Amino acid sequence: MNKILFYLFVYGVVNSAAYDLLKAPNYFEEFVHRFNKDYGSEVEKLRRFKIFQHNLNEIINKNQNDSAKYEINKFSDLSKDETIAKYTGLSLPIQTQNFCKVIVLDQPPGKGPLEFDWRRLNKVTSVKNQGMCGACWAFATLASLESQFAIKHNQLINLSEQQMIDCDFVDAGCNGGLLHTAFEAIIKMGGVQLESDYPYEADNNNCRMNSNKFLVQVKDCYRYITVYEEKLKDLLRLVGPIPMAIDAADIVNYKQGIIKYCFNSGLNHAVLLVGYGVENNIPYWTFKNTWGTDWGEDGFFRVQQNINACGMRNELASTAVIY
């Protein structure tokens, strides 16, 4: 088999939803080639295979029971704990108080459209990849500000997550942070630069921000305690995409479709709510993630509405108003 045919074969098998657990060794070798894995020793490779096999079994079970589809992907040789530790970054707060105004979403929702998506209005920037840096909090907050800027100025921009990692001393850089405290930090810093002026490094570094290059400034911030999940529809249409906290453990191997089974064993990841809709009579929310476009639905994922999917109904959703 020539090299081109080999990789076409690998791509087709690894991306198939009809997995067979008995073929786990074959899938694993294909996975190793596709993602250029080098484990350093046979002992470590065997350890990774056992984790891979466990994840494959879970993928098969989910594909049999959920309306969404799951696949072998770049995280499939990592345990859930490893993935959460390396690729998320939401820090659970000791206390949630800061100077962002608290709003309780405890009123029934108003009447609105059955479907709405800020992407269709070209107000959502491209999906980014946080890599092995626990800065989801920075990506989600800045993604919302990028959308705020697009709504206000009809221009898509990319803001600097690295500035947040290096210069936000309220949060902890690649070691984690929170959404409302990130907005607080931006207010204290005075603004945020463009990513092109302060490129992403996926690591903690010294603060090098230049206030003369601030493009976006925050004047107010809000934190929401979600009682009625449906009320998020009104809020989304009113204020723009919303950074939210979730438990990402059940979305790691997600490929496509509407997730019905996503539980909350502890909030650990920040994502951006960008829309909602209905498919096959199932109402869903659409989120933008920060794991690259090679994950999920081109970097986005959908969950069923009104089941507190992934623990999304909590008190950590936050937004900000820009000048």
Swiss-Prot record:
Origin superkingdom: Viruses
Record propeptide residues: 17-112
Glycosylation positions in this chain: N158
Keywords: Disulfide bond, Glycoprotein, Host endoplasmic reticulum, Hydrolase, Protease, Signal, Thiol protease, Zymogen
Gene: VCATH
Subunit and partners: Interacts with chitinase/CHIA; this interaction maintains VCATH in the host endoplasmic reticulum.
Similarity-based family: Belongs to the peptidase C1 family.
Protein's name according to its UniProt entry: Viral cathepsin
Compartments it resides in: Host endoplasmic reticulum
Principal localisation: host cell
Any matching Pfam family: Peptidase_C1
Gene Ontology molecular function: any one: cysteine-type peptidase activity
Mod. after translation: Synthesized as an inactive proenzyme and activated by proteolytic removal of the inhibitory propeptide.
Catalytic residues identified in the record: C136, H269, N289
